[in-house]
């Protein structure tokens, strides 16, 4: 990433995985109480920011299917601008890498990277806690990316505690299907009463290689998604025949963990023709973590 007074380029917006995802309740407002562990990956979209002197926020690259005014990146920049009253503007370029509707947090991560990068580019120096409070207004996953560490998450995903995770390589396979999160959350067959676990429960097993990630918990959304989307079910079955695998978020991506890049790439090489798979290393910290204190 280059850093100057006029631009910040090559800012990674990393993907996340849900190593497990339990739904423990439903609130009167319709939101669900969750428990999960979020894992950052060294793989994601890349954003570039160039200072404007006219105060305008502009997305200068087209993102198919996402109008500029509703793009979380633009909304994040305008939210930060309104909150601080800065006279600065910005041109934002987005190199999309992560598939949308995949459970990888792509849009949320883009928004968080925007908040962090503009905190530096606009010389705002807002503390991390203040950025996280703003991030909640953009979506439940955005505060995690501002938090910037692998985390045990509770509530609707905004209650975060740092967890230390071992370095692993992941193969992430994404079927060619978009899974609407709201559709899965509203399904009457979705489990909403999973027993609560503790961070101690998770940490007691997370260093074990036996059956990981199946050695702890599950993704409560996976059964509903695979019953509705045959493509996701097919990927889960294929990957599980290679090594224990699990869906992330509300899908559609499915992941498996490996001890080495070589093992992950060997599995990737066996993917059926036409399947989209990416190999990525785990991260312990967001690449822009230092942009907030």
From Swiss-Prot:
Active site residues according to the UniProt entry: 16, 141
InterPro entries reported for this sequence: GHMP_kinase_C_dom, GHMP_kinase_C_sf, GHMP_kinase_N_dom, IspE, Ribosomal_Su5_D2-typ_SF, Ribsml_uS5_D2-typ_fold_subgr
Catalytic activity from the UniProt record: 4-CDP-2-C-methyl-D-erythritol + ATP = 4-CDP-2-C-methyl-D-erythritol 2-phosphate + ADP + H(+)
MF terms in GO: 4-(cytidine 5'-diphospho)-2-C-methyl-D-erythritol kinase activity; ATP binding
Gene3D superfamilies in alphabetical order: 3.30.230.10, GHMP kinase, C-terminal domain
Protein origin, superkingdom: Bacteria
Keywords, in A-Z order: ATP-binding, Isoprene biosynthesis, Kinase, Nucleotide-binding, Transferase
GO BP, one annotated term: terpenoid biosynthetic process
EC code(s) of this entry: 2.7.1.148
Pathway membership, UniProt: Isoprenoid biosynthesis; isopentenyl diphosphate biosynthesis via DXP pathway; isopentenyl diphosphate from 1-deoxy-D-xylulose 5-phosphate: step 3/6
Protein residues bound to ATP: 99-109
Primary role: Catalyzes the phosphorylation of the position 2 hydroxy group of 4-diphosphocytidyl-2C-methyl-D-erythritol.
Entries under HAMAP family matching the protein: IspE
Family, as annotated: Belongs to the GHMP kinase family. IspE subfamily.
PANTHER family with a match to the protein in the record: 4-DIPHOSPHOCYTIDYL-2-C-METHYL-D-ERYTHRITOL KINASE, CHLOROPLASTIC (PTHR43527:SF2)
Protein name, entry field: 4-diphosphocytidyl-2-C-methyl-D-erythritol kinase
């Amino acid at each position: 990433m280059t850093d100057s007074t006029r631009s910040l380029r090559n800012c990674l917006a990393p993907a996340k995985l849900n190593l497990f995802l339990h739904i423990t309740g439903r609130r009167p407002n319709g939101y669900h109480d969750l428990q999960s562990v979020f894992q950052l990956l060294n793989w994601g979209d890349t954003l570039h920011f160039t200072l404007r002197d006219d105060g305008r926020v502009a997305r200068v690259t087209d993102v198919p299917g996402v109008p500029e005014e509703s793009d979380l990146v633009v909304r994040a920049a305008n939210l930060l601008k309104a909150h601080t009253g800065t006279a600065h503007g910005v041109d934002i370029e987005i190199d999309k890498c992560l598939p949308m509707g995949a459970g990888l947090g792509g849009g949320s991560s883009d928004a968080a990277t925007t908040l962090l990068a503009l905190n530096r580019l606009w010389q705002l120096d807002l503390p991390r806690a203040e950025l996280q409070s703003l991030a909640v207004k953009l979506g439940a996953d955005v505060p995690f990316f501002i938090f910037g560490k692998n985390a045990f998450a509770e509530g609707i995903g905004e209650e975060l505690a740092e967890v230390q995770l071992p370095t692993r390589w992941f193969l992430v396979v994404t079927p060619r299907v978009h899974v609407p999160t709201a559709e899965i959350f509203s399904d009457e067959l979705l489990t909403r009463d999973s027993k609560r676990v503790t961070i101690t429960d998770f940490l007691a097993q997370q260093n074990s290689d036996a059956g990981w990630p199946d050695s702890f918990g599950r993704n409560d959304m996976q059964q509903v998604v695979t019953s509705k989307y045959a493509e996701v079910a097919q990927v889960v079955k294929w990957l599980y025949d290679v090594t224990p695998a699990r869906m992330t978020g509300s899908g559609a991506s499915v992941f498996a963990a490996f001890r080495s890049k070589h093992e992950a790439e060997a599995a990737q090489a066996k993917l059926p023709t036409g399947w989209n798979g990416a190999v990525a290393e785990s991260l312990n910290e967001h690449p822009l973590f230092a942009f907030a204190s």
